[in-house]
Regions:
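Exported/periplasmic ABC-transporter solute-binding proteins
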Residues: 20-53, 57-67, 74-77, 81-247
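Bacterial N-terminal signal peptides that target proteins for export
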Residues: 1-6
């Protein structure tokens, strides 16, 4: 009995020694999906992912200034590539983990029609977008308005959020009547679950390919490598699919 208890204690100590922690900077559009992935990762690996949500552009600046992030889940491909060229991400570690979708959304039923014709009506109220200078979903929103020939009509009605999470908050709270948000923020199992929305056709803007990268600070952290490997696996991919992402 004593030998069994000693063996169990040793096993638990070994597992504890192997378990680690990884600091993850995740694009704001990932919202609930990344929390589900982090929970599943902890359950399946024993490692803990500490997730910070924010705009990709601001994370880029923070990593340059020495922020202790070890993994970046960006909302674009350019930022991980730039970090790699700057020596701040591990060469060859980048991969596309998701393709985001944009949706024009209102928290109210019947405001946004299934074809987005509300945009062609005289502007009523504010239209929320993420800051296009730092947020890829904000750039996609501007590209969409431009491709529809409606950017000038809506320019004075735009309200810019710091990131896509804040853009969603503006609409959900009623501070903006409509807004361009990430499909992942308002969808469950392929359909908009609250309010009304128009899923923007993919040809209306450049693809929102979202890349992950192992940052230089995480190069020697087994938990960071394990998290990226988990992100490639079916458990994480299933969560992302359910959240409306393309893979």
């Amino acid at each position: 009995m004593l030998r069994a208890l000693l063996f169990l204690a040793g096993l638990l100590a070994a597992l504890g020694a192997r378990a680690g922690e990884v600091q993850v900077a995740a694009a704001a559009n990932l919202g609930p999906a990344i929390q589900k992935i982090a929970a599943a990762f902890a359950r399946d690996s024993g490692h803990r992912a500490v997730v910070a949500l924010g705009s990709t552009g601001r994370f880029h600046a923070q990593v340059r200034n020495g922020a202790p992030f070890e993994v970046l889940l960006a909302a674009d491909q350019e930022t991980p590539g730039q970090l790699e060229s700057e020596g701040l991400a591990v060469a060859g570690s980048r991969f596309t983990y998701a393709v985001g979708r944009l949706v024009l959304w209102s928290a109210q039923e019947g405001v946004v029609d299934p074809r987005g014709e509300v945009l062609r009506q005289p502007p009523a109220g504010k239209l929320a977008i993420a800051d296009p200078r730092v947020a890829p979903y904000g750039r996609a929103a501007v590209e969409t308005l431009r491709s529809l020939g409606l950017l000038a009509a809506w320019q004075s009605h735009l309200v810019q959020a710091e990131n896509i999470a804040q853009a969603h908050q503006f609409v959900a709270s009623g501070n903006a009547r409509i807004g361009f948000v990430a499909l992942s923020q308002v969808v469950e199992q392929g359909r908009v679950t609250r309010g009304s929305g128009w899923i923007v056709p993919e040809q209306a803007h450049a693809p929102i390919r979202q890349d992950a990268a192992l940052l230089a600070r995480g190069a020697n952290n087994p938990a960071a490598a394990a998290f990226l490997a988990y992100l490639r696996g079916e458990a994480a991919r299933s969560i992302l699919r359910d959240a409306g992402y393309g893979l």
